[in-house]
Regions:
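HIT superfamily nucleotide-processing domains
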Residues: 1-115
Length: 115
């Protein structure tokens, strides 16, 4: 794998994660085709795991080339008639933070579902 998956600290969208390329590369165009294809394949695996676990009606993907220090994509589950449905997601709405135990449980569930 060429990626690392991090549970996003703010969980207004249950299951939100950030998929980060393992090396310090700033933009997708700096990756060779095999690396880029592997990164997107990993993204697909993570997306399928999130759909299986949380059953969102949609997944939004965000890449912030001017903010992120590495190639990174936010994968944001969206739920109909809930927060920010039919709107772009905020980078950090500061609304929902879990306990450490809840983060650990969610991370374990996601990790298991990705395998």
């Amino acid at each position: 794998d060429v990626t690392r998956v991090y549970l996003y600290p703010e969980q207004s969208h249950r299951g939100r994660v950030v998929l980060v390329y393992k090396d310090k590369v700033k933009s997708l165009d700096k990756l060779v085709p095999l690396e880029r294809n592997t990164f997107f394949s990993d993204m697909d695996r993570v997306a399928k795991a999130l759909k299986k676990l949380y059953a969102p009606q949609a997944l939004n993907y965000g890449n912030y080339g001017d903010i992120d220090k590495k190639v990174a994509f936010h994968i944001v589950p969206k739920y109909e008639n809930e927060f920010e449905w039919n709107e772009p997601f905020a980078i950090n709405p500061e609304k929902v933070f879990l306990t450490q135990e809840e983060y650990e449980l969610m991370a374990k569930e996601i990790k298991k579902a990705i395998k």
